[in-house]
Design a protein with these regions (language model features):
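Glycine-rich phosphate- or other oxyanion-binding loops that anchor nucleotides, phosphorylated ligands
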Residues: 10-37, 52, 86-226
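Extreme N-terminal starter segment of soluble prokaryotic enzymes
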Residues: 1-2
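Intrinsically disordered, low-complexity terminal tails and inter-domain linkers enriched
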Residues: 34-89, 122-123, 127
């Protein structure tokens, strides 16, 4: 099992930071999984003992020498247990992080989700459309809660309610990318979220106010249930 987070202000001792937002998360998670598959943790289950250790060292060095500080931190975390973490494809991916509530729900409550979307506010107002897939369901079911992802945080309560009417319960910046990458690699994935705010004019202030308590709650939940 691979547990990941966005990183920056959401660092956990049990999760690898992969990047904030849709783009960084997609790039870094893809790089991470691709390096594992290149090592040989594919359907053929190549025996790692037969692989030249110098080749494995080169792969790990690419993480350490990256200009991306999150990948450098990831390399340091991997070195604690390289046999388990670096050279095997995970049986599932669990993303942990904070989320906003569109309408219903409670602050500092834990929610699990295995359905992610990338629906922009402009499409709710019929000002845009997308010709590509905008919603993904993981091959592992974790309830019916749908999580929408965007690089922009919703701060208009009326628009947030419209998102809720469309079936979306949570807002998190990275989750859609996690599910999309996991889908490509055919890995089950789901998210564990703690609500820090409602998506309204107080979204940022409430996020700041509740974030420390949210991280503690999420840490306790993960360590007690996983």
């Amino acid at each position: 099992m691979l547990v990941i987070s966005a990183g920056k202000n959401e660092i956990f001792d049990f999760a690898l930071p992969m990047g904030v937002g849709l783009v960084d998360m997609a790039i870094n998670l893809t790089k991470f999984l691709q390096k594992r598959s290149c090592v040989g943790a594919d359907e053929k289950s190549i025996n790692l003992k037969n692989i030249d250790p110098r080749y494995l060292a080169k792969i790990e060095a690419k993480f350490a020498n990256s200009s991306n500080p999150e990948l450098q931190n990831l390399s340091q975390n991997l070195s604690k247990n390289p046999g388990q973490n670096l050279y095997q494809m995970p049986e599932k991916i669990v993303f942990v992080g904070s989320a906003g509530l569109y309408k219903d729900g409670e602050i500092l409550q834990i929610y699990e989700s295995s359905v992610g979307a990338n629906v922009e506010i402009s499409s709710i107002e019929n000002r845009s459309y997308s010709p590509i897939e905008c919603e993904i369901s993981s091959i592992v079911s974790r309830g019916t809660i749908k999580t929408n992802s965007s690089n922009f945080i919703t701060t208009d309560k009326n628009l947030a309610y419209k998102m809720f009417e469309k079936g979306y319960f949570l807002e998190n910046m990275e989750f859609f990318s996690v599910l999309k990458v996991a889908q490509i690699f055919k890995i089950p994935a789901y998210g564990i979220f703690v609500a820090t705010n409602f998506c309204d004019e107080n979204a940022h202030a409430d996020f700041i106010k509740n974030h420390s308590a949210a991280k503690e709650l999420l840490t306790r939940y993960v360590k007690e249930n996983m």
